[in-house]
């Protein structure tokens, strides 16, 4: 009798839809109008479908073979054979998933090995893994700061930092992007608070600007504050040895806590981490809600990430190559007359300012065989629409030149250059 019941349920698993209530209708109308407004303003985002591995040359679901210039795959490790093999091997030895949070039964030897490798890479005392850097930032501030404390944040910090700060009870202050005068004024005004934490991206993701960490550290020391750096767009390739923005400025030992991601240069999978002072990491293990209430990272991803750090420890070849590729792309685009955000980072924003123009430009580039995306409000401020190109160590010079030639053709057609 039980068996028959199960069979009937399986055969009739599609439940009838509930009748739409008046409240449901009103909500649907409101949401539909909001979506219509987004479309009319040229701000509607669509998702193109890729049917190959992430790489510099990919195929979309409509069969197009295109060059990819918009991935965070800075070191070209997303489809690296060694990284893939490490993930496959871990499937056999450690399984697919852990079905648990860390403090119950979700910690394997692989997780501890990866945390140790990250600590070694950054020269820090301890590391804690998260399912994403968004979660790492979401679980940091409310854990280590209270009502007696102050957090001072750069205005261009990533959304995850902004949301993480909103969750904490500390006094919140904000300074204009890399404005050291404003930062110092906030430090002066907040003297007497129990703890002052300066929070900044190491690299600001929409512009490719690198934070002035040497100047920030000087102020931090002068006013006895702490410093947190989200180095998601720097880990693995910024600095002489790829240790990030703090290494670039020679202040690695002065950063109290870093957050970063495994989902960009470090293989492009998923996962994030916080690394820094031992006491901070220990408290996060006890009280950080995204850590305590989220499943641990799956073993194949962890093993692949360990392999990434092994690859990075061998040489700086990939770091040097992405730097050279970015320099070549910037030089050719500038020579062609495009308006670029200045810098040396492989994030190279091509400024178009108008959202509809950015979308049309990206669409015409796709017809040329170059995959990029237009960025516009609310991802960037109103009137600051752009195409954010991202250069990889895996790009060949021929691929870069082909992309630039396509930019030039489209730019001339649309009157941009």
Regions found by a protein language model. Give the residues of each.
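Active-site C-terminal subdomain of aminotransferase-like
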Residues: 223-226, 233, 238-344, 357
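Active-site phosphate-binding strand-loop segment of PLP-dependent enzymes
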Residues: 73, 173, 177-229
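Conserved PLP-binding catalytic core of the aspartate aminotransferase-like
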Residues: 320-329, 334-369, 379, 383-384, ...
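N-terminal "arm"/small-domain region of PLP-dependent enzymes with the aminotransferase-like
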Residues: 28-96, 225
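Conserved PLP-anchoring active-site segment centered on the Schiff-base-forming lysine
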Residues: 140-159
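PLP-dependent enzyme catalytic core of the Aspartate aminotransferase-like
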Residues: 1, 15-20, 25, 81, ...
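Conserved N-terminal alpha-helix of the aminotransferase class I/II PLP-enzyme fold
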Residues: 85-133
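Pyridoxal 5′-phosphate
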Residues: 176, 180, 199-202, 237-242, ...
């Amino acid at each position: 009798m039980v068996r028959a019941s199960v069979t009937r349920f399986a055969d009739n698993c599609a439940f009838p839809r509930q009748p739409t209530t008046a409240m449901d209708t009103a909500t649907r109308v409101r949401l539909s109008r909001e979506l219509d407004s987004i479309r009319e303003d040229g701000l509607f985002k669509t998702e193109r479908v890729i049917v190959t591995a992430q790489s510099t040359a990919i195929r979309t679901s409509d069969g197009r073979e295109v060059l990819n210039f918009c991935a965070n795959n800075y070191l070209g490790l997303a489809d690296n054979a060694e990284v893939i093999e490490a993930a496959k091997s871990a499937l056999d030895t450690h399984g697919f998933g852990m079905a648990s949070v860390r403090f119950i039964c979700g910690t394997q030897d692989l997780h501890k090995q990866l945390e140790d490798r990250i600590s070694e890479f950054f020269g820090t005392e301890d590391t804690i893994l998260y399912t994403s850097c968004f979660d790492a930032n979401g679980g940091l501030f409310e854990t280590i700061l209270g009502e007696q404390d102050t957090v001072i944040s750069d205005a261009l910090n990533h959304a995850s930092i902004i949301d993480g700060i909103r969750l904490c009870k500390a006094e919140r202050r904000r300074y204009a992007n890399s404005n050291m005068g404003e930062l110092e004024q906030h430090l002066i005004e907040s003297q007497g608070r129990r703890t002052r934490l300066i929070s900044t991206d190491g690299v600001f993701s929409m512009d490719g600007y690198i934070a002035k960490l040497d100047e920030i550290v000087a102020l931090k020391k002068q006013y006895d504050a702490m410093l947190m750096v989200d180095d998601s767009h720097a880990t693995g390739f910024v600095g002489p040895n790829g240790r990030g923005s703090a290494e670039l400025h020679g202040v690695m030992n002065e950063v109290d806590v870093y957050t970063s991601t495994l989902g960009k240069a470090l293989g492009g999978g998923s996962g994030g981490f916080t690394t820094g002072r031992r006491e901070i990491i220990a408290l996060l293990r006890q009280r950080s809600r995204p850590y305590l209430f989220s499943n641990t990272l799956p073993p194949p991803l962890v093993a692949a990430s360990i392999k990434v750090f092994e690859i990075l420890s061998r040489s700086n070849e990939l770091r040097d190559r992405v730097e050279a590729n970015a320099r070549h792309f910037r030089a050719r685009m500038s020579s062609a007359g495009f308006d670029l955000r200045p810098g040396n980072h492989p994030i190279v924003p091509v400024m178009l300012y108008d959202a509809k123009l950015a979308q049309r430009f990206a669409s015409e580039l796709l017809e040329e065989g170059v995959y990029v995306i237009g960025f516009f409000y609310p991802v960037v401020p109103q009137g600051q629409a752009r195409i954010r190109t991202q250069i990889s160590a895996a790009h060949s010079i021929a691929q870069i030149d082909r992309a630039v030639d396509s930019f030039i053709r489209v730019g001339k057609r649309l009157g941009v250059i």
